[in-house]
Amino acid sequence: MLRSTLSNWREYLTPISHTSTFETSGQLTPEEFVKAGDYLVHMFPTWKWNGNDFQNVHHKDFLPNDKQFLVTKKVPCKLRANNYLELDDTETKDVGDGWALQEEHSQDSERKSTNNADDSELPEELEELHIVDDGDDEEYDDQLYDNEFADDDIVDIRPSTLRFYDLYITYSTSYRVPKMYLCGYDNDGTPLSPDQMFEDIAADYRSKTATIEPLPFLKGNNISVSIHPCKHANVMKVLMEKVRSSRSRARKVDPQTTDEDWEDLQSDVDDGLRVDQYLVVFLKFITSVTPGIEHDYTMEGW
């Protein structure tokens, strides 16, 4: 609780910056956060802004009243985090404090998107990228959930394992990046205790990045688990550098490239990852912290 209190004071005291440093720092201004949120809501309609519910919201004056935070509700979570096995046959690149970038080489069964959003605008170089924890998880039975069963059948078979989460994203003034909050419920709608919610956080992150705290943007005592954003900007910088490096290498080996093409190619490198795509990529690496939560924005190839 002390950590949560100190974090709230830091959020309150940190001055707001409206100068964009996205390309160099991986951080966002409030205006860029809104732009990225609009893109997320447009591409994935299960995500929504808080809208006109002004009565129950603590407003920050540097954000529009109807765009204080993003929310998606009743996201299923059928297995606990320890049931997920770290993928084998991969290469990883450490980005500090336990975060690792993973490039997929094995034929694993990825969670598929349940919506029809087109992710073709995302840089091609990121399609094979995963971000995973570097802890040792227990192996789970691959036959536990047969594809022949529908979701309703699963609820009947294993009612005690099914949970739901409301996910919130707001803007962190102290780190100038998005910050994720999770509120969990049992399958009968009973709120989960903090210890129960921690069961759905990957073991390697529970003591590093997860904090129990009330939702700061809603009135009342809504207990949540927040994902500490201290490394988010650094991870985004690594992702952007990956895009630039990949496209730069492609330019060097392309025999069709001429001097006249340089300006267009340089523009492609500079614009490899747009600021409005920030939250889509942000949610990709959040899945390494909450592997059991079945985000419906998880796309094939990630």
From Swiss-Prot:
Biased composition (Basic and acidic residues): 102-113
GO CC annotations, alphabetized: cytosol; phagophore assembly site
Catalytic residues in the record: C230
Key word Cytoplasm present: yes
Positions of region (Flexible region): 84-159
InterPro entries: Atg3/Atg10
GO molecular function: Atg8-family ligase activity
Superkingdom of origin organism: Eukaryota
Subcellular location(s) of the protein: Cytoplasm
UniProt keywords, alphabetically: Autophagy, Cytoplasm, Protein transport, Transport, Ubl conjugation pathway
Entry remark concerning the domains of this protein: The N-terminal region is involved in phosphatidylethanolamine-binding and is required for ATG8-PE conjugation. The flexible region (FR) is required for ATG7-binding.
Subunit structure, interactors included: Monomer. Interacts with ATG8 through an intermediate thioester bond through the C-terminal Gly of ATG8. Also interacts with the 40 amino acid C-terminal region of the E1-like ATG7 enzyme. Also interacts with the ATG12-ATG5 conjugate.
Protein role: E2 conjugating enzyme required for the cytoplasm to vacuole transport (Cvt) and autophagy. Required for selective autophagic degradation of the nucleus (nucleophagy) as well as for mitophagy which contributes to regulate mitochondrial quantity and quality by eliminating the mitochondria to a basal level to fulfill cellular energy requirements and preventing excess ROS production. Responsible for the E2-like covalent binding of phosphatidylethanolamine to the C-terminal Gly of ATG8.
PANTHER family: UBIQUITIN-LIKE-CONJUGATING ENZYME ATG3
Family (UniProt): Belongs to the ATG3 family.
Name of protein: Autophagy-related protein 3
